[in-house]
Amino acid sequence: MSHPFRTAVEARDLDAMRATLTEDVVFFSPVAFQPFRGRDAVVEVLGNVLEVFTNFTYTDELAGDGTQALVFRATVDGKQVEGLDHLMLDEHGKVTRLTVMLRPLSGVIAMAEQMGPRVAHIAKGTG
């Protein structure tokens, strides 16, 4: 059974995504040195990610006790990327920590170039 976070991302539904996160969720991005903290900041960043990624699709998922890994493919500025959303869950199944890994380096650089201007104001307030 898929985690509601996956369902929300696939539907591009920010309200549903917000409902899957704890108030104090921490998001570790592959293109930011400091994590984003708090549900409002994380939802704003993820909304921007959804605008930058095209052809986004989850291709696999792995689940364990209190954790979920969602493997994905997408395109960023014409570059194919592969990545993984690693979710750490609380006792209610809500996301307490989200770590995103991305490859190859050319895709990470493209992502950083696209996301930097969009989220700089968020990063200053959450690190």
What are these regions, as identified by a protein language model?
Residues 1-127:
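C-terminal and inter-domain tail/linker signature
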